[in-house]
């Protein structure tokens, strides 16, 4: 699917590898971290971060894992430690083709005053010059050091954002984390999904609003540990539009339970653990993605039949979902097993 979020696994929707965040900790001090935005950093820092990020982005575009590995912080450049990043580079490279790369935002994150064995979040607040907005970082277990965060945009039919966490080692900026993210789903960007979500919310179509707000968040944030004034506003709007059944969230530990009663026999119960939007294989259509818990995957035919019934139960319970999606992909999940995927076109679901 074209909206894969980490490596080559659809399930790991949140993308990126953060290298070296495993230390035994003591509480951090509030003043231990500072952020300097692009407008206020020194020219040496600004050009150093920008050049390093662009070189890394070019290496990713070329699928040159060896070059990325050579520019990675030493403790995570061994073959075994670098393997997850290498897989991510290879999965991302094919999506960038001949896109033009441009460094669009950089931040200097100074954590040089953190305690030696601090594993708490390293919090950075970055007020943006001339505005009331800010960008915030909360990086778990960040080791002491001078860091930078750089965002490289790609242009093309399917734009991407390549974000890099860099650490300065002996005057050289090296890779400490890599976070590639698609910037569009089914040909639309995050702002479009945000506006559409607002429209659905006003129409009291809360299930569509909740999904579209979520997709806007997914497309607009550069990494899971980054927030901003705009993202906070988006998340507040999503909370306000959350359907009553989802107030407590939806997860493997807190599934959404739907029951379907057939003409004959007892009710069937479906436990949904995740629901979101995603592009079709060709990037042209928007599909609804459902993850449903399965106790047994040994009989593929039975799993497929159950997944089809689960999709119909969801669409019957929330008819508005039929209007926004081309198809439904159901992932039947069972612990310790690869999910069984069933695809249906909504027009073929009675």
What kind of feature is each model-predicted range?
Residues 3-19:
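Bacterial N-terminal signal peptides that target proteins for export
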Residues 16-28:
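Bacterial N-terminal signal peptides
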Residues 31-62, 74, 177-192:
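Short, low-complexity N-terminal intrinsically disordered segments enriched in polar/charged residues
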Residues 33, 123, 144, 148-188, ...:
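Short beta-strand edge/turn micro-motifs at domain boundaries
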Residues 34-44, 50-54, 66-133, 217-247, ...:
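Short solvent-exposed beta->alpha transition segments
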